[in-house]
Amino acid sequence: MENRKNYFHLHLISDSTGETLIAAGRAAAAQFQSSHALEHVYPLIRNRKQLMQVMEAVDGAPGIVLYTIVDRELAGLIDQRCREIGVPCVSVLDPIIELFQSYLGSPSRRRSGAQHVMDAEYFARIEALNFTMDHDDGQIPADFDEADVVLVGVSRTSKTPTSIYLANRGIKTANIPIVPGVSLPEGLLTATKPLIVGLIASAERLSQVRQHRVLGTTQSFHGEDYTDRAAIAEELKYARSLCARNNWPLIDVTRRSIEETAAAIVALRPRLR
């Protein structure tokens, strides 16, 4: 079949941490190197209100929907809304669960996150996920000292997906956008506990990703310079200077996967391992 797109939106909806979906989605996407998956991860979706907000996001950026939702009513709602929107969706675990049921001759428990043992480590991961979702993109800037890691960087340097990946390892992570001319929160500059790391990428790569981002929106929503390489180069220059002034380590994510970026962050502070 002819390759239709060089990028696509991949929506991953889970009633647990989302690790299963992330692994499955990336394994599948890796088979199509000419198409780049723009991941949207929605963990801990367990009621209708949460799910309807997710489906609004899917409607705004149509693409492939993968989900692991054991509640049959919610799963049915995903199927229904995806049909209405006109996007494909797959319940990743259902075929596997049905195979187990057939072979073992007994029904499954249909319990969210049943693969996780309810121990201290598990609850730490859930706490980290909640913290990270609450502190995405500069939200709640007053309590940075509760974070283990704070990621700073210009737009589209994978701050959010990297934060969620770290949270899945029990690492409380906040992220802050770097915008030239806009001061960083005062609480970040006085924080003593978190490891603060700057994320950068090449201007060429950021321009490509941002061009994909603005598709379906108006350029004026982001600003005329949002995808301009020269303007992006100035943003990166400012970000490098800011990190250098504050002695924050920098990681170039241009050719790194989310997993590789997270590993590089953890390597900077052994206590996070």
Curated annotation (Swiss-Prot):
Top-level taxon: Bacteria
Enzyme Commission (EC) number: 2.7.11.32, 2.7.4.27
Keywords for this protein: Kinase, Nucleotide-binding, Serine/threonine-protein kinase, Transferase
Pfam family, one: Kinase-PPPase
Any GO MF annotation of the entry: phosphotransferase activity, phosphate group as acceptor
Catalytic activity: N(tele)-phospho-L-histidyl/L-threonyl-[pyruvate, phosphate dikinase] + ADP = N(tele)-phospho-L-histidyl/O-phospho-L-threonyl-[pyruvate, phosphate dikinase] + AMP + H(+); N(tele)-phospho-L-histidyl/O-phospho-L-threonyl-[pyruvate, phosphate dikinase] + phosphate + H(+) = N(tele)-phospho-L-histidyl/L-threonyl-[pyruvate, phosphate dikinase] + diphosphate
Top EC category: transferase
InterPro entries: Kinase-pyrophosphorylase, PPDK_reg
Residue numbers binding ADP: 153-160
Recorded family membership: Belongs to the pyruvate, phosphate/water dikinase regulatory protein family. PDRP subfamily.
Role, per record: Bifunctional serine/threonine kinase and phosphorylase involved in the regulation of the pyruvate, phosphate dikinase (PPDK) by catalyzing its phosphorylation/dephosphorylation.
NCBIfam families the UniProt entry points to: PRK05339.1
Protein name: Putative pyruvate, phosphate dikinase regulatory protein
Source organism per UniProt: Sinorhizobium medicae (strain WSM419)
